[in-house]
Every structure is written in C-alpha cells, then in structure tokens.
Amino acid sequence: MKFFLDTANVEKIKEFNALGLVDGVTTNPSLIKKEGRDFYEVIKEICAIVDGPVSAEVIALDAEGMVKEARELVKLAENVVVKIPMTKEGMKAVNILSKEGIKTNVTLIFSANQALLAAKAGASYVSPFVGRLDDVGQDGMFLISEVMQVFSAYGIETEVIVASVRHPIHVIESAKMGADIATIPFDVLDKLFNHPLTDNGIEKFLADWEAHMNR
C-alpha cells in the first residue's frame, strides 16, 4: 500500500519523506490557504521534494476552465496530478485531459457509483472520502469495500486513494481491503508509529541494561 501525505506543509513533507514513507502528496485549496503561501510556489516546491504524484486542485467549476487550469498546472512539474471535483463538468474535463495524457485525481467521491463514473471517464485516481461519511452517520470504510469490489470485478486500473482519513484504523482497514493508497494527514501518520507496549519494551530494555552495567 502506498502512503500519500495529505498536506501542503513543506516542512512536514520533508520530515516524513526523509523516513522513506512518502509515496506522494495530496493538496487542496483549504490546505494551501492554511500555509498562507502562493499556490503555484507551494506545488512546485512539493514536487521538487517528492518523486511521486502530487495532486493540485483546480478552482474552476466548468469543464473549459478546469482543462485550462490543468494544462497550466502540469507545466509546473512532471509529477503533478490534477485534482478534479466529481461533477458532470468535472467528468467532461477528465475525459478531455485523459486523452491528452494528463493524470487526474477525482475528488469528493462519496459513493461507488461516483467512483465508477470517474474511472469510466478516464480518471487516473479516485478519492473516496471516508471520514466525512462517518461524520454524517454512514460507514466510510464500507464505501471503500464497495469501490474495491467493483474495480476488482472489472479489472479497472484507476487507483483508489482513501481520503479524509481521521485515525489509524482508517489506514489499516484500507490496507486490509486492498486499497491502493491512503492519503494521510501528518498527525495521523505520526500516530501509526505509537504503541504503549513498544514504549514499555524500550523502557524495560534500557532499565535491564543499566542494571546489568551497574552490577
């Protein structure tokens, strides 16, 4: 399973990339706004750090505008993937861009039907949002199982990016279901390292070693 970092924070990307854990990065307008920097500068800097795909989202809502933005975004770096919203206009743009060889990541997916439509339109990636479904009383992980089942049944090559990840359970459940990628906020990725028994074990080893050396 591949891990993408869901952030526009360059320092955090550098930190986790140095550990060999970052296969790609996803951004969105909200994450860029949080950093308070120029959109294009941030994307270029991230692309220079990470070898894998870096998703940058369009702002236009019409297909013509999305395509125009996408063509500009891919000029920034070879690893830019254009993030497109799941709408009719978005799918029109995805269809055009896929024929031009421009990779796309269809975002804001909340049903298996939407994921299937995006794949048929030519999306390189689809991003089902699990946390937001959980927030409204639905089972976000059930959506992932549905999408994986449909894609597997038809040999669909579009990769599934589990998005809106809120906690480590989302990550491991996605891995168990065979999802291609989880895009993870850095605070959640930090939590994957931790287990109280690991901490206890380290403390015991150190205490035993100190006792041995002081005999």
From Swiss-Prot:
Annotated keywords: Cytoplasm, Pentose shunt, Schiff base, Transferase
Any Pfam family hit: TAL_FSA
Enzyme Commission number(s): 2.2.1.2
Reaction(s) this enzyme catalyzes, per UniProt: D-sedoheptulose 7-phosphate + D-glyceraldehyde 3-phosphate = D-erythrose 4-phosphate + beta-D-fructose 6-phosphate
InterPro entries reported for this sequence: Aldolase_TIM, TAL/FSA, Transaldolase_3B, Transaldolase_3B/F6P_aldolase, Transaldolase_AS, TSA/FSA_arc/bac
Main location, first listed in the record: cytoplasm
HAMAP family for the chain: Transaldolase_3b
Name by which UniProt lists this protein: Probable transaldolase
Organism the protein comes from: Methanococcus maripaludis (strain C7 / ATCC BAA-1331)
The gene coding this protein: tal
